[in-house]
Amino acid sequence: MTILRKSHPIMKMINHAFIDLPAPSNISGWWNFGSLLGVCLIIQISTGLFLSMHYTSDTMTAFSSVSHICRDVNYGWLIRYMHANGASLFFICLYFHIGRGIYYGSYLYKETWNIGIILLFLVMATAFMGYVLPWGQMSFWGATVITNLLSAVPYIGPDLVEWIWGGFSVDKATLSRFFAFHFILPFIIAAMAMVHLLFLHETGSNNPLGIPSDADKIPFHPYYSYKDLLGALMLLAFYLTIVLFFPDCMGDPDNYMPANPLNTPPHIKPEWYFLFAYAILRSIPNKLGGVIALILSILVLALFPLLHTSSQRSLMFRPISQVLFWLLVSDLFILTWIGGQPVEPPFIIIGQLASILYFSIILVLFPIAGLIENKLLKW
């Protein structure tokens, strides 16, 4: 008689994905971020569900309802801050996860990588719409500025913006639809994450050496299930430290003021996790050019598999590419810093140089470094 987990139709699927899954024996802590993203998504959906029970998506009462959640609902303050900081945590894990994929050449699993890029777009859209819901000053003006970018689309731009707004400005209709989309998108993300996992399990995981590991596989459980559990506990410790001791450290003080269409905040800026893309957007003086650069700053990830010129998969033994990778990471930190600064010298030129460097490293320097390293191997 076979074990139930190997014969039952539903348990069989779980078994193949999380128990008897053959995994490389040498994958490091950088491979923990996939499961940590799953934990983040579960936290966000759970806390979001409870918040939605008390939130009202009306311009007159949205700000008050968030205040009511924090003041009058049992542990409402905790749920609200868990949800707000959970978004930051989600993006921290997401950027580590993408960085791991670039460093170890995981992007060569093209289907998994491309679905990951779609997931990134979905998560960014969800986070943006969620930031609008508390209806504070930065919520309102952030929504106005970002949705206004669509007016740069030739010919249909102005109509497109009014269609998304549901009127002639960001108002009640906009808030209602953003709430509806913000509620449904995480479930679409969860479904897409399953497809992401499905394609990953078609090929099996990559490993730090970037070489086939078929000769040396170990079962996912107990080895990596316990490793992921340890990672999740470390993540939760960090997460709860932020939520309980520094709940507002990643927020904007302007968002504690109710939305006022007649009063513009001195510096309109998105949450920290969008600042790098915002800096790239602002570094181009032309509106349409800026919007294209903004979209390309994420879409450029899809070119990684096409621009892979090295005969090795991982950067483990490629010192020139390693230097470029860490230069790219440093450049993203600079872009994040610039995105939060006002548009004035010397920040303008620094942002423009950092934007040029960002695209140059990915589109030009990485492929050239790969070819040079191939030559060095034969030398």
Swiss-Prot record:
Note on how the cofactor is bound: Binds 2 heme b groups non-covalently.
Superkingdom of the organism of origin: Eukaryota
Main location: mitochondrion
Keyword ATP-binding: no
Transmembrane segments: 33-53, 77-98, 113-133, 178-198, 226-246, 288-308, 320-340, 347-367
SUPFAM superfamilies reported for this sequence: a domain/subunit of cytochrome bc1 complex (Ubiquinol-cytochrome c reductase), Transmembrane di-heme cytochromes
Membrane topology: Multi-pass membrane protein
Named cofactor requirement(s): heme b
GO MF annotations, alphabetized: metal ion binding; ubiquinol-cytochrome-c reductase activity
InterPro entries assigned to the protein according to its UniProt record, in alphabetical order: Cyt_b/b6_C, Cyt_b/b6_C_sf, Cyt_b/b6_N, Cytb/b6-like_sf, Cytochrome_b, Cytochrome_b_C_euk/bac, Cytochrome_b_N_euk/bac, Di-haem_cyt_TM
Binding site for heme b b566: 97, 196
Cellular compartments per GO CC: mitochondrial inner membrane; respiratory chain complex III
Locations listed in the record: Mitochondrion inner membrane
GO biological process, one term: mitochondrial electron transport, ubiquinol to cytochrome c
Positions of a ubiquinone binding: 201
Tagged with keyword Mitochondrion: yes
Positions bound to heme b b562: 83, 182
Protein family (similarity comment): Belongs to the cytochrome b family.
Task of the protein: Component of the ubiquinol-cytochrome c reductase complex (complex III or cytochrome b-c1 complex) that is part of the mitochondrial respiratory chain. The b-c1 complex mediates electron transfer from ubiquinol to cytochrome c. Contributes to the generation of a proton gradient across the mitochondrial membrane that is then used for ATP synthesis.
Record protein name field: Cytochrome b
The species this protein was found in: Perognathus fasciatus
Organism ancestry: Eukaryota, Metazoa, Chordata, Craniata, Vertebrata
Gene: MT-CYB
